[in-house]
């Protein structure tokens, strides 16, 4: 009997680097809280150990400066620590980046729900996301911004 194939991506640990919660007005118990949510991701590779990397997810929800628009402001930053098996580093880097966000995102969702539920307000429950689609959109925006900056530099 063959051993199952080794997974190319290993999730080692995660830490919560930042939490900020501001309650502007107490919503009614049955009121649904609607917030504008911004999600940002970043991947940092270890120069000394190229098979190790950190995935950072930053989420802000609500308006910090305009409380009239938002009863709640929330900002969290969570770091996940990952490792790729060395034989597969070049082949799976993009795959690993997308999957590391997909692995880490439920922890961030749970953190946000817990913070708001423990604040004794209706919990904010982020929906599941299509990580591959989100990452593709982020890359498109980055490429557009890079092209725009290059164009502006030559004008």
Swiss-Prot record:
Q: Which GO terms describe its biological process?
A: protein tetramerization; protein transport
* S-S bridge residues: none
- InterPro entries the UniProt entry points to: SecB (IPR003708), SecB-like_sf (IPR035958)
Q: Which domain of life is it from?
A: Archaea
* UniProt cross-references to SUPFAM superfamilies, sorted A to Z: SecB-like (SSF54611)
A Pfam family matched in the record: SecB
Name recorded for this polypeptide:
Uncharacterized protein MJ0357
**Cross-referenced CDD domains:** Translocase_SecB
Q: Which GO terms describe its molecular function?
A: unfolded protein binding
